């Protein structure tokens, strides 16, 4: 079997970033594969999240903070200068795209086709052709045409999703995986520096999954046997990364 990676955010900012990243990956998958009407679920979820909260200010602050830190790292010896330069240039470009006055995805509200679909998609079984004949018509179009439409809709969120992907890459890069053991299925850790993300990599052959809880300075991991749906009493070896 293969190793599975589980991530637990330890603050609300990273929690939001991970949700947006999850939707972004679904959007990319829908651009590469024809999933018929299912492609609209992540798109509408992203619309709803962006309407609830304007993430731009938080992301712009995070970009500035990381650019400052990267500039300091540039002055250090034995540093991967090419990698640092890549992130500085990518974040600078992302900052410029995100500084537009209009909220990401706001223009999609004016799209009558999407608005009609979105009103119905929350209802069970509401994608029948008698409920949404316009969807039935759109799905009959060639995949290349539908893909172009979908790319145009997704592009409205790229100024937000691109920097979030970069910021999460930087967050994950702050810690390498290290071997750890959960005795009797339990592991507890602490840190003197503020943590933002706990990552657990465990072999699926163990037949269990971790439930992770905690805050910026302390966290706990309980392993649960999937078949029995109860806490494991076995010692579980896994890989752990605690990201600042």
Curated annotation (Swiss-Prot):
Entry GO CC: cell division site; cytoplasm
Fetch the SUPFAM superfamilies from UniProt. Answer: YacF-like
Query: What UniProt keywords apply to this chain's record, in alphabetical order?
Result: Cell cycle, Cell division, Cytoplasm, Septation
Q: Decide whether keyword Repressor is in the record.
A: no
Task: Please list which residues make up the signal peptide.
Answer: none
Localization in the cell: Cytoplasm
The source's superkingdom equals Bacteria
**Functional description taken from the UniProt entry:** Cell division factor that enhances FtsZ-ring assembly. Directly interacts with FtsZ and promotes bundling of FtsZ protofilaments, with a reduction in FtsZ GTPase activity.
Q: Which PANTHER family match?
A: CELL DIVISION PROTEIN ZAPD
Q: What family does the entry list?
A: Belongs to the ZapD family.
What is the name of the protein in this document? Cell division protein ZapD
Q: Origin organism of this chain?
A: Shewanella oneidensis (strain ATCC 700550 / JCM 31522 / CIP 106686 / LMG 19005 / NCIMB 14063 / MR-1)
């Amino acid at each position: 079997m293969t190793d599975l990676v589980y991530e637990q955010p330890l603050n609300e900012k990273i929690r939001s970033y991970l949700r947006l990243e999850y939707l972004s990956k679904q959007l990319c998958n829908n651009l590469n594969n024809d999933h018929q009407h299912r492609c609209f679920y992540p798109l509408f979820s992203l619309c709803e999240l962006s309407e609830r909260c304007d993430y731009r200010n938080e992301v712009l602050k995070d970009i500035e903070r990381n650019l400052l830190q990267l500039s300091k790292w540039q002055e250090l010896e034995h540093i991967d200068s090419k990698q640092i330069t890549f992130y500085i240039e990518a974040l600078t470009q992302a900052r410029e795209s995100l500084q537009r006055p209009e909220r990401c995805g706001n223009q999609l509200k004016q799209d009558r086709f999407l608005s009609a679909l979105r009103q119905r998609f929350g209802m069970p079984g509401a994608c029948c052709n008698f409920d949404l004949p316009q969807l039935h018509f759109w799905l009959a179009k060639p995949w290349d045409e539908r893909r172009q439409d979908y790319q145009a809709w997704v592009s409205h969120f790229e100024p937000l999703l691109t920097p979030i992907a970069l910021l999460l890459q930087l967050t994950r890069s702050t810690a390498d995986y290290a071997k750890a053991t959960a005795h009797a299925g339990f592991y507890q850790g602490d840190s003197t520096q503020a943590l933002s993300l706990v990552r657990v990599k465990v072999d699926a052959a163990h037949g269990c999954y971790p439930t992770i809880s905690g805050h910026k300075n302390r966290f706990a991991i309980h392993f649960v046997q999937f078949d029995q749906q109860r806490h494991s009493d076995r010692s579980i070896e896994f890989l752990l990364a605690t990201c600042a």
